[in-house]
Design a protein with these regions (language model features):
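Non-catalytic beta/alpha edge segments that cap or flank active sites
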Residues: 1-74
Length: 74
């Protein structure tokens, strides 16, 4: 018989929207992702929008992992 030991893990998510035109006011997909995460009991620690530039995206993902253990790029 196998015994499983599980412990709860707190998940803190970062939501990164990639767009050169969207703003926090009109980013409906980012807002929907945050809403779904919060409904699932997952806190959103970071929400940001970055330009569609690979270096900016990479920098934001790496920075986000300093304070969040889940990063969603949208």
């Amino acid at each position: 018989m196998q015994v499983h030991h599980e412990r709860p893990v707190h998940i803190s998510a970062a939501v990164i929207t990639v767009s050169s035109t969207r703003t926090k006011e009109n980013d409906s997909s980012g807002k929907e992702i945050m809403h779904l995460l919060e409904m699932a009991g997952i806190s959103v620690g970071i929400y940001t929008i970055v330009r569609d530039d690979i270096e900016e995206i990479r920098r934001e993902v790496l920075t986000s992992f300093r304070s969040c253990n889940c990063v969603i790029v949208n």
